[in-house]
Amino acid sequence: MYCIQCEQTLHTATGTGCRFARGDCGKTAAISDQQDALVAALLAVSSHADAARKVGLIDAEVDAFVPQALFATLTNVNFDPERLAGYIRKAQELRNRLQLALAGKPLALPALADADWPFAAAQQAEAGKIVALNRDAARIGEDVLGLRLLCLYGLKGIAAYMEHARVLGQTDTQVAAGFHAHMAYLASEPTDAKGLFAEALAIGTLNFRVMEMLDAGATGTFGDPQPTPVNRRPVAGKAILVSGHDLHDLLRILEQTAGRGINVYTHGEMLPAHGYPAFHAHPHLIGNYGSAWQNQQAEFAAFPGAIVMTSNCLIDPRTGAYQDRIFTRSIVGWPGVRHIEGEDFAEVIACAEALPGFAATEAPVTQLTGFGRNALMTAAPAVIERVKVGKIRHFYLIGGCDGARAERAYYADLARMLPQDTVVLTLGCGKFRLDGIDFGAVDGLPRLLDVGQCNDAYAAIRLALALAEAFDCGVNDLPLTLVLSWFEQKAIVILLTLLALGVKDIRVGPTAPGFLTPNLIATLNAQFGLRLISTPEETMAETLSA
């Protein structure tokens, strides 16, 4: 086992990364190795898909499958060996189909593309060891390995967003072509550091287009988000909790529970769903329960209803003994947990009806969400005017992925200390760090603006570009500071997107990605001013000194 893809990866005297019997996320060494085997199989498929495009062959099934299956290898997504084995078998089938289609064509493919490892289910962990991500670290050096992993984890993040967009009807053959080309590049086992660095930024550029697609899919399907108060307290009655990121699944659950006397709650990054007009038509979408993903074992154990995980992040449900009332969807999996194929949630509804639900209604406590792209752009003229007259001095984007490290208290501490002439934008499950802080308003404008899910960084980027145009300056000249919390691979690709757009002086934390060596961190600092978080006091002194 060698896994170093998330923020909570182990740091020991013998090295960085989860390398023993079990990762810190809970996946076993066998599952980790099986996921590495799946990654290798997908790199092989993409290598053939990239070659096929060069001779005019496009396989739509391949274009959909590879990102979806790669999504299954993200942190806290799929721990089910049978499901992973199925993805590997399918990858082999598609690779073989493309091989036949390309037979006789004079194409140069990397050795990985045509390799035949023992991918029978019982041997996949062994195959994973053959293709372990650090298998040639001694030969290529830690810097090149780190850059390869930066590209791979960026591709994992973009794969997740491509799948989210596909579910909402958004596909693009040019995006698929770019994705396969990047995968094929990695399959060639590159060793040129400059080339790898450029590739990482190109992945970030491609992701900007994918975030645009996802934004179009969400707003085209559900309408433009509107500022909406969300109840954060239970209401008496039967209950279903929907976690993850998939708005499509949430809508189907609401449609199928209408008139059944079941209240539906969002959890984690599903909270921004309340801002979309399409969900306002369902009054039994009653509120948001709980907070960020890392608290789910206690929160799910206390929830008296059925639970649906539509995407990451899933933690071992056995700890809270709720494995018999949690269901997985799409690419999510856990051994022994019931998986919902298709869009029929009858089993979930029956489970909720058999459970007690909440006995009493608590006094409401609300949180405002819904400051998506359109809402921000609509407010932009008023924001610009407040900046010009000195009522708003600085903007802070404080958000991203949350996690369990104590150092993450920095984000809430910084938000509390910021003066009243500053505005805070937040997104992702990092928003829950700011719970309980009374931000008030600046001349009628709320000081805290929840932009949405992690992928809604697109809306924040669009606002920054609009402000830069209005003030006739570059984005880096704006009174704007990005303070990002990262945890997994979606955050990595968003960071790459920001860097590809030329955004500088980003602060990230709570720790540096384990796959980035000191040399790579120094390079990112020199070229982009990228730095780790320090203390709230230092951040304020550095950003408000002018």
UniProtKB/Swiss-Prot annotation:
Its EC number is 1.7.99.1. Belongs to the HCP family. Its cofactor is [4Fe-4S] cluster; hybrid [4Fe-2O-2S] cluster. It catalyses: A + NH4(+) + H2O = hydroxylamine + AH2 + H(+). Binds 1 [4Fe-4S] cluster. Binds 1 hybrid [4Fe-2O-2S] cluster. One of its GO terms (molecular function) is 4 iron, 4 sulfur cluster binding. One of its GO terms (biological process) is response to hydrogen peroxide. This is Hydroxylamine reductase. InterPro entries: HCP/CODH, Hydroxylam_reduct, Prismane-like_a/b-sand, Prismane-like_sf, Prismane_a-bundle. Disruption phenotype: Cells lacking this gene are unable to grow with hydroxylamine as the sole nitrogen source. It comes from Rhodobacter capsulatus. Hybrid [4Fe-2O-2S] cluster binds at residues 245, 269, 313, 401, 429, 454, 488, 490. It is found in: Cytoplasm. Inhibited by cyanide and by sulfide and iron reagents such as dithioerythritol, 2,2'-dipyridyl and o-phenanthroline. Optimum temperature is 40 degrees Celsius.
